[in-house]
Regions:
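Sec/Tat signal peptide C-region and signal peptidase I cleavage site
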Residues: 29-33
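Hydrophobic/aromatic beta-strand elements that line small-molecule binding cavities or substrate pockets
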Residues: 128-133
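Low-complexity, intrinsically disordered terminal/linker segments enriched in charged
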Residues: 108-112, 116, 122-125, 143-160
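Bacterial N-terminal signal peptides
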Residues: 14-27
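Short, aromatic-enriched amphipathic alpha-helices that serve as compact interaction elements
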Residues: 36-54
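N-terminal secretory signal peptides that target proteins for export/translocation
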Residues: 1-13
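Short, solvent-exposed secondary-structure junction/capping segments
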Residues: 50-54, 58-80
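Surface-exposed, charged secondary-structure patches
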Residues: 68-124
Length: 160
């Protein structure tokens, strides 16, 4: 019986190390595209427009990782390559101090979900309609409509 104790301890240590290795492997995986719900997608967009940490107060970054995570394939290149835009489309201004943000699912139509977003930016009311799709990796933005324009047309107009 005494001979089994060291062997059992070795087996347990190996088991724990394997579990830890699996866990560490999943934790080190790159960020996947998409989000779990349309509301989560919208919340994560506006998390980049706060007054807090530097990485989350400069607006949604225009890089390929952000583009892959937030946008469908049709918008990814346009978003990542857009530099020097006249204003930030998501806040409809060049600067921001956002009030409370509300979002409501307007309708679900085929593969698209329309999410109405309303907030104030520097005291001015802003309304946008996010058109989001549930892709293989989660929810991503297919387009965003303002009363005067759409994100897709805005990026095409200001292509570098």
């Amino acid at each position: 019986m005494a001979d089994k104790a060291p062997r059992m301890r070795t087996v347990m240590v190996k088991f724990v190390l394997r579990i830890f290795t699996l866990y560490a492997g999943f934790a080190a995986m790159p960020l996947e595209a998409g989000f779990r719900s349309p509301e989560s997608l919208v919340r994560n967009v506006y998390a980049h427009y706060g007054q807090g940490l530097a990485g989350f107060s400069g607006g949604l970054p225009h890089d390929s990782d952000t583009a892959r995570r937030f946008f469908d394939s049709g918008l990814q290149t346009g978003w990542a390559s857009s530099k020097g835009l006249p204003y930030d489309f998501f806040v409809q201004g060049t600067s921001w101090k956002l009030g409370a943000i509300s979002s409501t699912i307007l309708r679900k139509q085929y593969d698209k979900t329309y999410v109405a977003v309303a907030f104030s930016n520097n005291g001015r009311a802003v309304t946008l309609n996010f058109i989001v799709v549930d892709g293989p990796d989660g929810w991503v933005i297919a387009d965003v409509e303002s009363p005067h324009d759409s994100l897709r047309m805005f990026l095409a107009q200001h292509r570098n």
